[in-house]
Amino acid sequence: MLRSIFDFNQRSTKMVMISHKLDLILVFIIVIGGSIFRRVSANFTVPCNGRCGGLTLPYPFGFSNGCSIRFDCSAAEKPMIGDFSVQNVTENSIFVGLSHNCTRKIEDMNPLFGENFAPTSENSFLMENCNRTTDGCSIKQKFLENVLKLKSCDATGNISCFSLDSNSSSKNSAKFFSMKTLRNSSCSLLFSSIAFESVGVNAGIALEFERVRLGWWLKGGCESGTCAANTDCTDVETPHGYAGHRCSCLDGFHGDGYTNPCQRALPECRGSKLVWRHCRSNLITIVGGTVGGAFLLAALAFFFFCKRRRSTPLRSHLSAKRLLSEAAGNSSVAFFPYKEIEKATDGFSEKQKLGIGAYGTVYRGKLQNDEWVAIKRLRHRDSESLDQVMNEIKLLSSVSHPNLVRLLGCCIEQGDPVLVYEYMPNGTLSEHLQRDRGSGLPWTLRLTVATQTAKAIAYLHSSMNPPIYHRDIKSTNILLDYDFNSKVADFGLSRLGMTESSHISTAPQGTPGYLDPQYHQCFHLSDKSDVYSFGVVLAEIITGLKVVDFTRPHTEINLAALAVDKIGSGCIDEIIDPILDLDLDAWTLSSIHTVAELAFRCLAFHSDMRPTMTEVADELEQIRLSGWIPSMSLDSPAGSLRSSDRGSERSVKQSSIGSRRVVIPQKQPDCLASVEEISDSSPISVQDPWLSAQSSPSTNTLLGNIPR
């Protein structure tokens, strides 16, 4: 009995031991299985769906739970953040549309402040109902009406800019807005916003109206190790206080830097395109050139790169605020949306191109109101171009003269600033003188254009305070409207004169053949520099010749030198445009000679020997009114257009112009006959120096003390 009990106990003990072993094995299986399950789960996380309709976004953006930055896919298959449409995503920004709304509350902006994104300091919010003036700019309602095409808002509304000051010079620590910041703005309504960014290495600024720029990040610093291989990790100081980061592929690699590893871009010489000798030759050339130049430029390039990297963000921020303030403050100029400009020119089509100027290309365009305009697109994306467009806007909006081209508006939304002018259907004076358009202009019309142009330039010199010097007067900058009236254009090289001195030291700018020779040598700019350029235009009007023509004899390549030589030696008739010589009457021939004498004085080498533009305009007006009545048809041949009978019946010797009477002698074979000048009160002639002390008020020049 005892033995049986003992045996039973032994069996029970063995069973218990086996049971414990089974329990241990089960626990081991559960632990190991759980570990294996977790590892498997880690390798098979919920995927990120980056597709919305026909759009596919790269990770970390997407539309499902597996995406670190999740957007909504609307019924219209467009990415959304709440009620705001996502317009673009880049390696560091999310661009969201923010259309104008007169009643939008600040709290409605909550969806734009997420766990992984927020508006950056590269925005300027347009606020309404502000209790105090914001630190940013103040925008007039008319400006917003022009840019945003508003119709429903109260025109008396108080619109102010609200921006963050960029105090950091580091590219990687851009400041962010917060809801608390907006609530503390003392404004109750948020009307819209303007996003800006730097374009190009010299910090040109592009403004995007009705847009918000959001900076994005993933949680954790770069030490979290979420970036894939061949990436550059950027630490982000988030507005929430915790660390954030962004991953981006290195130069020469492509991918998203996270789930899609960055792979090196494939070279051209590969696969079916592999031609060993061709690739080997290219490789040797590339490697040799790279190695040879790299060591020479590396240190210098690195120095400038570091310097620009530290200064660009702050300069960009301040430039954008300055541009916005200046643009908004000048309510007399309309601001056109970039989309309207692009549509007006058919996407800046070659068919709409009118010509190429010193700083940009001019296109013909048709606005939404069916008005034809000339659109000048500046091509330089640098700080000089930005200053250039603001300078031209200020100049053109401050002048008002019937013979100066009128600025209708501008566009500063994109990197290329755009100016919009009134359209001139009859082209330029140069086109008509060179017969590129029409069959030539009659003398009476040429004289009218010259007179109107001189009056416009004289207005810039004498009626503006300080005076404005054009610096690029030429026949291609003299436009003709529907009635062939002159319109002086292109203030791209204009500079404001200084009242305390008669010259400005600056680098010579302008067009070869028109540039003041004294200015080119001495770097002194004055009103007389424009007088010289206009003298070249007068020579063009008389001769119909090109200003610089290498097909002419060597001594006659430059029209100014040719005109001075022929006029000074009494051979004016040799250079008169043949189309004017078909049937000249006495007054026409006399007036051509008188204008030639005026051109001769304008082309004097020394500036103090030239007349002022006011004197030039007065003399041309006297010539124009002296002997003819403008009754002509522009469709008639130039040679058949004469002066009036009153002018034709006069003898040349009796043709009085002001206080002068010009006697035109018979042309001698040696072409050395002098021009006899009979004057009631003035001893001045073509051969005598034109001294400013005799008739010009501008006597204070650098050459004033040179003995004559």
From Swiss-Prot:
Residues 43-285 are extracellular. It catalyses: L-seryl-[protein] + ATP = O-phospho-L-seryl-[protein] + ADP + H(+); L-threonyl-[protein] + ATP = O-phospho-L-threonyl-[protein] + ADP + H(+). CDD domains: STKc_IRAK (cd14066). Residues 643-652 have a biased composition (Basic and acidic residues). Glycans are attached at residues 43, 88, 101, 131, 158, 167, 184. It is found in: Membrane. It is a single-pass type I membrane protein. Residues 1-42 form the signal peptide. Residues 636-659, 686-708 are annotated as: Disordered. Its main location: membrane. It is an enzyme of class 2 (transferase). This is Wall-associated receptor kinase-like 14. It comes from Arabidopsis thaliana.
